Regions:
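Short alpha-helices
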Residues: 8-51, 60-67, 263
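Accessory interdomain/linker segments of ATP-dependent helicases and helicase-like nucleic-acid enzymes
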Residues: 298-362
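Single-stranded nucleic-acid-binding OB-fold domains
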Residues: 343-347, 367-371, 384-395
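OB-fold and OB-like beta-barrel modules that bind single-stranded nucleic acids
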Residues: 262, 320, 339, 374-387
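Short gly/pro/ser/thr-enriched loop/turn and capping motifs at secondary-structure boundaries
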Residues: 2-7, 13, 21-23, 227-230, ...
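OB-fold single-stranded nucleic acid-binding module
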Residues: 276-281, 376-402
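Beta-strand/loop nucleic-acid-binding surfaces
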Residues: 248, 356-372
Length: 402
């Protein structure tokens, strides 16, 4: 799903559905999808040459769980083809036929493979695998996914879980430092957010950029040291701004400012000389203004309207959770008015609520929100099942309220 540059590498073969002239129809494949289709094509060619029988060769559907995980974790657009890949992988997981490493990761995350859904892949398994590459060596995550030994898989999954806990701590510290820098008296508001700190960890800047983008709703770049004289940044954008196009414009307006960059509409990475950051930040801001004609952005909240009371239950929540939702194919978001009967902070940064609508009472949670709400609210929310002591109930996950 990454877009190639103007000049392609001098190679015998380039496999990228987004390169000019490629007729492969699914342009939103993650890297794992590209290699999966390449393996299918290779097997077909080996069958044609007689290396395998017409229906012989390796059973590649045995890899569908890994393909699903990679597709969701890479946050690619879930078009029809990607949803098919994820659906096949989830079905394999729910049947219990999954790689030992995935089974171990489900265990350390406290999730049940037989009820696997896209949320598990994107928010429970994916971050634990990625944590190794962010803070240490990605080979641990690869080894966990590829081992056939159940005991080794569990040992590695536990190590990945510990690394992920460390990642959360580092990310929280960096996020607080970034917010403090944004709130400094000399921090001029602009169309973008662009931050750098010499003490930040290179592997976590993308997560910090994502958090800042959500908070300020602007294209965001966060940088950390990447060598003696270089800094490397990771960016996250909003639907109104194509991030790679912005960086391409900066590179054309200021040819020596960016040493290298790549990415797509919603995310990108780049490298600068450390001494060039003060010049880059305003150039980035100016490029966004030039491409969009705007200096501020507001999120547009699209909902599916009010949910009839008869459908606000655990059964419907369970049906929704079994579907494939994600980037470009969001889960239903409902909009209703509630009375707030009780509210309290849990984990210091999440708001736990007891809500009332007519004769119905609901438990609800707003992740990452620590401000109290008025007695009456209009809330945009999603349904999810909550399992506690063997009892299944419906919980509302608040996305916006006021």
């Amino acid at each position: 799903h990454h877009l190639p540059g103007d000049t392609l590498p001098d190679a015998l073969a380039i496999v990228n559905p987004n390169q000019p002239g490629c007729g492969f129809p699914s342009k939103n494949l993650a890297g794992v999808g590209v290699i999966f289709y390449m393996m299918l094509a290779l097997r077909a060619e080996l069958r044609r040459r007689g290396v395998y029988a017409p229906d012989g060769g390796p059973r590649l559907d045995a890899l569908s769980d890994l393909v699903a995980l990679g597709t969701v974790a890479d946050v690619v657009k879930l078009d029809a083809n990607n949803r098919l890949l994820v659906t096949q992988g989830l079905q394999r997981m729910r049947s219990g036929r999954l790689q030992p490493g995935l089974r171990a990761l489900f265990a350390v995350a406290g999730r049940e493979p037989r009820a696997a859904n896209g949320f598990d892949l994107g928010f429970a398994l994916g971050p634990r695998i990625n944590a190794a590459g962010r803070l240490a060596d990605m080979s641990l995550g690869i080894a966990c996914l590829t081992t056939d030994d159940e005991a080794q898989a569990l040992e590695m999954a536990r190590e990945l879980d510990n690394i992920n806990r460390e990642r959360r701590t580092i990310e929280a510290e960096m996020r607080e430092q970034a917010l403090a820098a944004m709130e400094a008296p000399d921090a001029a508001p602009g169309a973008t957010v662009c931050v750098f700190d010499p003490g930040w960890h290179q592997g976590v800047v993308g997560l910090v950029a994502s958090r800042l983008k959500e908070k300020f709703w602007r294209p965001t770049l966060a940088f950390a040291p990447a060598g003696d004289d270089e800094i490397r940044g990771s960016g996250r954008s909003i639907p109104d701004v194509h991030l790679r196009d912005v960086l391409d414009l900066v590179s054309k307006r200021h040819p020596n400012l960016i040493r290298k960059f790549g990415g797509h509409a919603m995310a990108a990475g780049l490298t600068l000389g450390r001494q060039d950051f003060p010049a880059f930040a305003p150039a980035f801001d100016a490029a966004v203004r030039e491409l969009t004609g705007r200096d501020s952005f507001e999120p547009v909240i699209e909902t599916d309207g009010s949910l009839e009371s008869g459908y606000a239950n655990a059964e419907v929540a369970g049906l929704l959770q079994q579907q494939v939702w994600g980037a470009g194919f969001a889960a239903p978001l409902f909009l209703d008015e509630f009375v707030v009967r009780n509210q309290r902070l849990v984990g210091e940064k999440h708001l736990k609520l007891s809500l009332e609508r007519g004769q119905q009472r609901f438990d609800a949670i707003w992740f990452g929100h620590d401000q109290s709400l008025p007695e009456r609210i209009q809330a945009a929310y999603r349904l999810e099942q909550n399992v506690w002591n063997g009892m299944v109930s419906v919980q509302l996950v608040i996305e916006h309220a006021g």
